[in-house]
Amino acid sequence: MGNSALKAHLETSQKTGVFQLTGKGLTEFPEDLQKLTANLRTVDLSNNKIEELPAFIGSFQHLKSFTISCNKLTSLPNDIGKLKKLETLILNGNQLKQLPSSIGQLKSLRTLSLSGNQFKEFPSGLGTLRQLDVLDLSKNQIRVVPAEVAELQAIEINLNQNQISSVTQEVSRTPRLKVLRLEENCLELSSIPLSILTDSQVSLLSVEGNLFEVKKMRDLEGYDKYMERFTATKKKFA
């Protein structure tokens, strides 16, 4: 991409607060964006070949939405935790295996999407994200849903297409959790904690494509209670 084209993009972004440059084969985060740290509210650099984010990413104090899906990121800099106004962070289709501890400082974050990365463990340190509504960890290699999931404020957690064979009982204590997606994992019927059915807020539990027939769920203790929540939610949105 030529300098003049980039310059035109930057000039437009200065006015709009939006910088979108997708599918251009970029191998580096555009350094010229440093000039717009005071302006930018939305950045989308999806479908490029960017391997790392610069430390100056932390200086975009007004950034609300950052999408950098389908690149080649293997890690994130600690400075990403400085984005105090960030509400949406989309990192799908990279090569991330873990998150920096500073991610827990993103106090405004509502959506964190990490689908299609290389996580083998459920990322830790997300319990401090008090505004988090949606956490997408689908298409990774996670095997266990650990007890610390109970610390999350998320309303929806998507764990479809992992390698999960174990789900903690504590998941029922996740205070705002309404939607739990566990499709296409390695779960036996006996691995589903009954407390999700009997004692949680979950009104949509999707478990298709595991090692049991979904209709066998009907025989589990607490299934009727779960169905009451499921039906009530459906009526609300009908």
Swiss-Prot record:
Keywords (A to Z) from UniProt: Leucine-rich repeat, Repeat
Entry superkingdom: Eukaryota
Keyword match Repeat: yes
LRR repeat segments: 10-36, 37-62, 64-82, 83-106, 108-128, 129-152, 154-173, 174-199
Name of the protein: Leucine-rich repeat-containing protein 57
Organism lineage string: Eukaryota, Metazoa, Chordata, Craniata, Vertebrata
